[in-house]
Structure formats: structure tokens, C-alpha cells
Amino acid sequence: MIIDSSRIPSFTQLHSTMTRAPLLLLCVALVLLGHVNGATVRNEDKWKPLNNPRNRDLFFRRLQAYFKGRGLDLGTFPNPFPTNENPRPLSFQSELTASASADYEEQKNSFHNYLKG
């Protein structure tokens, strides 16, 4: 009985195939776990707009607590995010909006006239 040695894989071929399979399975498992965990985190985190004063106040209080928990007290620094404690009445804000709108129309018309030559 003659055994053809060309059909028998060598030790290095078997070893490299055996180490690739578990490594490939590990990579696939990590990718799938990352997608599952990433999807749950994305569903839980919903950002609220900071133009609402309550949301803005909550955001900055949580940010300050985060830094304080890591040993950095932001109370010793000047306030880089000033909040408007006494907002103007609505009539002043509408005047500013009307003024800004008039300025925009003026610039738009002057640019249009410039293009006409």
C-alpha cells in the first residue's frame, strides 16, 4: 500500500487553518456585539435642543457635575457660557427680528442691483 504524501496537509497548513477559524469567529462576534450595543446606546440617547432654557440649564449642570467628578471644579473659572437671566420682553425681540429682516432685504436688493450693473 502506497500513501500519496501530496494529499496529506502538512502541520503548518493545519496549524494556520486552525488558528484562522477561531480568530475569524472572534472578529465576527465582536462586530456583532458592537452593533447590538451601539444600537441600544443610540436609541437611549436623544438630544434635546439647547435653545430651551430648561434643557440648557440641565445640560450645563450635568457637564459641570461630570467635570467636578473628575477633579476639575468649573466654579473657579469664569463663566464661558453666559445664560440670559433676564430675557428681554417679546416686543424688543420682535423689533430686532424686524430690523434684521430689513437689513437682509436691503443687502439682497443692493447685491441684485450690483449684478444688474
Curated annotation (Swiss-Prot):
Gene it is expressed from: C2orf66
Organism field: Homo sapiens (Human)
Keywords attached to this entry: Secreted, Signal
Signal peptide: 1-38
InterPro entries recorded: DUF4720
Name of the protein: Uncharacterized protein C2orf66
Subcellular location: Secreted
Entry superkingdom: Eukaryota
GO annotation, cellular component aspect: extracellular region
Taxonomic lineage from the root: Eukaryota, Metazoa, Chordata, Craniata, Vertebrata
